[in-house]
Amino acid sequence: MNPLIQSLTEGQLRSDIPNFRPGDTVRVHAKVVEGTRERIQIFEGVVISRKGQGISEMYTVRKISGGIGVERTFPIHTPRVDKIEVVRHGKVRRAKLYYLRALQGKAARIKEIRR
């Protein structure tokens, strides 16, 4: 990587990111701007993927809201996310959990592991 680009991105990397993987349930505190007001919106769900590396790393969180699946993709190092809390760790054998989109109810549960 170009040394100039590398030096610019190192200053923007966040150090307060917890260790989480696909299958973990996380609570994301995202900043939402509505007009002139800014508030924190909590989005809690299962991490179904992580992709990329460095400043461009992203993760996708899926939750069921009103019987409908909702997915949001967040950059890991964005200032729009106030904090990320890991609620529980899940035991999965895949890096991408896109198969959860087709499952409903108890079939979509992920076994919890103690870390």
UniProtKB/Swiss-Prot annotation:
Which GO terms of type biological process are on file? Answer: translation
> What Gene Ontology cellular component terms go with this record?
cytosolic large ribosomal subunit
KW Transcription regulation (keyword) present = no
Q: Which UniProt keywords apply?
A: Ribonucleoprotein, Ribosomal protein
| Pfam families membership | Ribosomal_L19
SUPFAM superfamilies with a match to the protein in the record: Translation proteins SH3-like domain
NCBIfam families attached here? rplS_bact
- Record family assignment: Belongs to the bacterial ribosomal protein bL19 family.
Protein purpose: This protein is located at the 30S-50S ribosomal subunit interface and may play a role in the structure and function of the aminoacyl-tRNA binding site.
What is the name of this protein?
Answer: Large ribosomal subunit protein bL19
Origin species = Streptococcus pyogenes serotype M2 (strain MGAS10270)
